[in-house]
């Protein structure tokens, strides 16, 4: 076989005797040709069948049957005498005279008007308002702040207004001032800061 290496003969294999095989002598058997037997044919005598003469059929004479036309009986018409019905003369209806009913005009009752005497209300003389003298805000805010008990900002005094100035006036902290400023625009950052303060409390 290709690709298979031959084994190197070892000492054991070399010691063995190599047996030489003799080819067996083939016997040539003489083939006998098969002998075919010819079958003897039997001659069968055929009988001739006598043909029967069939008598010719005579055509049957057709009877001409006279067809009778169906006779229609004419029904005798009965003459019915019509009676003339006397017409009834309907009396002409007289038009019914309509009664002219005099329509009564609804009489309206005139309600007597009550004359209500109006009382003349005496006009109250309103005293002329005197112009209120404007209070001149003094430069010293300390006296007003101490009297009012409210800090100088436009809101109620809270704990945030704890810082007291040297003059004795309570001044709001920056947080309290910014909350009330109308011009202040709120941003997302300020909202977040305020929420954080509320949560911390």
Swiss-Prot record:
Gene Ontology molecular function: DNA binding; structural constituent of chromatin
Q: Which InterPro entries match?
A: HC2
Tell me the domain of life: Bacteria
Q: Give me the ranges of the annotated region Disordered.
A: 1-69
* Gene Ontology BP annotations: chromosome condensation
- Keyword entries, A-Z: DNA-binding
Sequence ranges of Basic residues compositional bias: 8-50, 59-69
Ranges in a coiled coil: none
Q: Which family does it belong to?
A: Belongs to the histone H1/H5 family. HCT subfamily.
Tell me the NCBIfam families matching this sequence.
Answer: histone_lik_HC2
Q: What is this protein's function?
A: Might have a role in establishing the nucleoid structure of elementary bodies.
Q: What name has this protein been given in UniProt?
A: Histone-like protein HC2
Q: Which organism is it from?
A: Chlamydia trachomatis serovar D (strain ATCC VR-885 / DSM 19411 / UW-3/Cx)
């Amino acid at each position: 076989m290709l690709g298979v290496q031959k084994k190197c003969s070892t000492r054991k294999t070399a010691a063995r005797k190599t047996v030489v095989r003799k080819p067996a002598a083939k016997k040539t058997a003489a083939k006998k040709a098969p002998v075919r037997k010819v079958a003897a044919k039997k001659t069968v005598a055929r009988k001739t069948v006598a043909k029967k003469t069939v008598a010719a059929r005579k055509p049957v004479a057709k009877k001409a049957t006279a067809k009778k036309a169906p006779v229609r009986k004419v029904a005798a018409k009965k003459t019915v005498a019509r009676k003339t019905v006397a017409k009834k003369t309907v009396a002409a209806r007289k038009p019914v005279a309509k009664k002219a009913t005099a329509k009564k005009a609804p009489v309206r009752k005139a309600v007597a008007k009550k004359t209500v005497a109006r009382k003349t209300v005496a006009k109250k003389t309103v005293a002329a308002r005197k112009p209120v003298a404007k209070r001149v805000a003094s430069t010293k805010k300390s006296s007003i702040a101490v009297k009012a008990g409210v800090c100088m900002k436009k809101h109620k005094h809270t704990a945030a207004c704890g810082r007291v100035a040297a003059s004795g006036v309570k001044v709001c902290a920056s947080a309290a001032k910014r909350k009330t400023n109308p011009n202040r625009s709120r941003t997302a950052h300020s909202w977040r800061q305020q929420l954080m303060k509320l949560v911390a409390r």
